[in-house]
Amino acid sequence: TRLPIALIKKHLLGIHNVSFFVPKTPLQRGLWALAHESSMFPSRGAQLLRDLTSQNVIEAHLVTSRFAFLEQNLYQFLNRWNLRQCFTSITLNKREEQPHKYKERVIRKMKFDYFLEDNWDIVAHLSSAVTDTEIHWIYNLLDRNRVYPTKHPYLEHALQDIIKKKHRSS
């Protein structure tokens, strides 16, 4: 659904800047929470993430643009799939900032070497706004033909690429 909405915003409404919907009413938040329940399974690569973090090969931080009202939902998901312990820190968008601006702020503050993101609009923003962090994009089926230097079909591929780069630089 993201592609048709983006086309309507750009070509019919003339909106060219990146902006995301922020649910405010109880109904909107309920529907938003329901939509995020669709993330029922972890990404392909979750086991590799568990292995790499438990062996201290990488230090992982979860930076999610999910809003504060989804915090319980997020922790239930992470606990259900034994992923919570993988992360040194978990940061939610508790101030309901625009997701791309929120992630830019957190990346600048934390000074990450690498950042993985699955939303093209956020990747496009971060890749020009944050130059000290290598932004990796985990693309979806609709966006697979976009050209981007560090794009991956799955979390697993992104992690493997980062590990190769870490070994080359050490």
Which residues fall in each region the model found?
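Acidic, Mg2+-coordinating phosphoryl-transfer loop and its flanking beta/alpha structural elements
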Residues: 109-156
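A short acidic, amphipathic alpha-helical/loop segment
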Residues: 47-48, 77, 105-106, 122-129
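Short, acidic loop-to-helix structural element flanking the phosphoryl-transfer center
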Residues: 20-21, 29-61, 68-75
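A generic "structured core" feature
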Residues: 2-7, 11-12, 39-43, 49, ...
